[in-house]
Amino acid sequence: MTQEDTYKTITDLAEGIYTEKRSKFIAIAIPVRTLEEVKQHLEVYQKKYYDARHVCYAYMLGHERLNFRANDNGEPSGTAGKPILGQINSNELTDILIIVVRYFGGIKLGTSGLIVAYKAAAAEAIAAATIIEKTVDDDIYFAFEYPFMNDVMRIVKEEEPEILEQSYDMDCLMRLRIRRSMMPKLRARLEKVDSLRFIEEEEETFES
């Protein structure tokens, strides 16, 4: 499998707990798709744990893993958000938000202690989650004349794309979705069908 059209994420919310010198770290791993979802979840958990000393987090979005952020929420710089993000990266995850809530136990942990604790808490949440691999899919839209229906359907049957849309008349229309790495072969086969022409649209990418 190629790396460019697959990515790993989690299926459902998962929690983990880590305790160090009476400080309690509650980690919540949440599947997200957009920055708006991230903001909504942060608002919910900041209200839920209003009495906590710190509510730190990190997130990663998109199959290319280019949209990310780490937040220390008042902890010394680089001691909370960065180790949380480090766990996301080491597990090669995306479309994920990890929030770690800290209840201070009265004993300071120091910079290195905080890094270890936030890293461990995030790791606990990830360990409790179900990780799945998904594919990045692309669409193709085309028209062809009805007499060539059998040729098209033979290709569809053999290449097994998802049929999103189809209409049959003298001029038939069809929209298919298939994993990105398999699109070149599908398109090349369709190009050989007499009368078939592709309808170019603004490119869209779908994370299945």
Region roles according to the model:
Residues 131-146, 176:
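Short glycine-/aliphatic-rich beta-strand segments at the starts of folded cytosolic domains
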Residues 80-128:
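Active-site beta-strand/loop microenvironment that shapes enzyme catalytic pockets
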Residues 28, 55-57, 95-99, 139-141:
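Structural motif
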Residues 176, 182-185:
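Terminal, non-globular segments
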Residues 143-161:
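Short amphipathic alpha-helix segments
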Residues 1-78, 199-208:
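C-terminal regulatory domains involved in ligand/effector binding and gene-expression control
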Residues 163-167, 192-208:
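Conserved short beta-strand edge segments in small beta-sheet-based binding/regulatory domains
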Residues 152-158, 185-194:
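Short amphipathic alpha-helices in soluble, non-transmembrane regions
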